[in-house]
Regions:
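ASCE P-loop NTPase motor core, strongest for the SF2 helicase catalytic module
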Residues: 1-166
Length: 166
């Protein structure tokens, strides 16, 4: 909290928005959806934000129509996982993970789901990139740059085990 991640991302969205870029997809915990909406209204009022969550969320053609009028879609990790088949078909300008430690377990349903989301750019926001084990960093980095650090097992053998031993 208080690291300025929200404001930095909003500034990026405002300054890097080039038409005809599609919308960005921002995943966050449910407790932060309202905060993202409020901060966007306050600091980036020209950004068109759509909160995609809850039982009344749009699907199918209604969602497609909304996306044409939207710069940022804010949703929760749970909603994105449930709506994955539809969200994974969209070419997002940017896929952003707020509180990216939510994917620290590479075997989790959430981590596997976000890996299927297509975006021209990927951003991970977290104030706690490694809470317990170095392998958690691999999961976040593999979302950002798939394959850059090699397989999870190679990363574990080459880096995690030696570092965590000392």
């Amino acid at each position: 909290m208080g690291l300025g991640k929200t404001l930095q991302l909003l500034a990026l969205e405002v300054t890097e928005r080039v038409e005809p870029a599609g919308p960005s997809l921002l995943l966050c915990p449910m407790s932060l959806v309202g905060n993202w909406q409020a901060e966007a209204r306050k600091f980036a009022p020209d950004l068109r934000v759509y909160a995609h969550h809850g039982p009344q969320r749009l699907r199918g053609q209604d969602l497609t129509d909304q996306l044409a009028r939207t710069d940022i879609v804010v949703t929760t990790y749970g909603t994105a996982t449930r709506d994955l088949d539809e969200l994974a078909e969209i070419d997002w300008n940017r896929v952003v993970l707020d509180e990216a430690q939510a994917i620290k377990n590479r075997h989790s349903r959430t981590a596997k789901a976000v890996g299927r989301l297509r975006g021209e750019h990927r951003v991970a926001l977290t104030g706690t990139p490694v809470e317990n084990r170095l392998g958690e960093l691999w999961s976040i980095m593999d979302f950002l740059n798939p394959g850059l650090l090699g397989s999870a097992e190679k990363f574990r053998t080459r880096y995690a085990i030696p570092v965590e031993r000392h």
